[in-house]
C-alpha cells in the first residue's frame, strides 16, 4: 500500500455520515471493498468543493484494502516528478509504477500545471493501460467531467478538443462520476 503518512490510519469508521449526500458515496466504497476483486467493479470519479472529504473517503477505502497494492497519487505532485524525471531518464519507470498499481487513486486531477505532454504522454498512457487491463481506478477532483474536459482542451496549440475527449473517454470507462457535496471539514 502506497499512502501518504497522513492517510495511513484513516478507516471507514472515521468518515462522518452526518450528511445524506455522503452516504451513497460511502456505501459505494464499502461495497467496492466487500466485493473486491470483482471483474464488474468500476472506480469512482468523486468531484466537489475543497475540503468536503473526497480524498479522505478514498484514503479510508485504500486503508480498508490494505492487503491489496493500493496506490494514492497526488496527481499534481506526480506530474512534477515526471517532468523532473526527464533529467534522469526515470519517466517510463514512474509511469509504469502508477499504471500497474492494483488499485489506483489519482487524487486532485485537474489541479496540475496543465500541458499537452502531460495529458497525452503521461495521463492518457496510464489510463489506456488501466482501461485495457480493467484495473480499478478512482479519482478526486474539483472539476466535473464536463469541466475537466474543457480544461484539458485548452492547449498551447489552441483547441485540443479531440485530445481531451480521448482522455475523458478513458476516465468515463474507468469511473462513475459522483458529485460529493457538503461543508468544508478541514
Task: Tell what function each PLM region has.
Residues 1-13:
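Conserved ASCE P-loop NTPase core motifs with emphasis on AAA+ ATPases
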Residues 11-44:
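Pre-Walker A (pre-P-loop) alpha-helix and adjacent loop at the N terminus of AAA/AAA+ ATPase modules
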Residues 23-27, 62, 66-101, 116, ...:
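Short glycine-rich substrate-engagement loop in P-loop NTPases that contacts/grips substrate
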Residues 38-58:
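Walker A/P-loop nucleotide-binding motif
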Residues 39-40, 98-101, 132-134:
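Short loop/turn elements that form and flank the Walker-type P-loop nucleotide-binding site
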Residues 104-105:
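Walker B beta-strand of ABC/ABC-like P-loop ATPase nucleotide-binding domains
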Residues 108-109:
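Walker B catalytic acidic pair
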Amino acid at each position: 500500500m502506497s499512502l501518504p503518512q497522513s492517510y495511513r490510519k484513516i478507516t471507514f469508521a472515521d468518515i462522518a455520515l452526518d450528511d445524506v449526500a455522503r452516504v451513497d458515496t460511502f456505501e459505494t466504497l464499502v461495497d467496492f471493498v466487500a466485493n473486491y476483486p470483482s471483474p464488474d467493479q468500476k472506480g469512482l470519479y468523486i468531484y466537489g468543493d475543497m475540503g468536503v472529504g473526497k480524498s479522505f473517503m478514498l484514503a479510508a477505502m485504500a486503508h480498508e484494502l490494505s492487503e491489496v497494492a493500493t496506490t494514492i497519487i497526488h496527481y499534481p505532485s506526480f506530474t512534477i516528478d515526471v517532468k523532473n524525471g526527464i533529467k534522469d531518464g526515470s519517466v517510463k519507470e514512474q509511469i509504469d509504477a502508477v499504471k500497474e498499481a492494483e488499485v489506483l487513486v489519482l487524487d486532485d486531477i485537474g489541479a496540475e500545471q496543465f500541458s499537452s505532454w502531460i495529458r497525452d504522454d503521461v495521463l492518457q498512457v496510464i489510463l489506456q493501460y488501466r482501461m485495457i487491463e480493467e484495473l480499478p481506478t478512482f479519482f478526486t477532483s474539483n472539476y466535473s467531467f464536463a469541466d475537466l474536459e474543457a480544461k484539458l482542451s485548452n492547449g498551447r496549440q489552441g483547441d485540443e478538443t479531440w485530445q481531451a475527449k480521448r482522455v475523458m473517454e478513458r476516465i468515463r470507462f474507468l469511473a462513475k462520476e459522483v458529485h460529493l457535496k457538503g461543508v468544508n471539514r478541514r
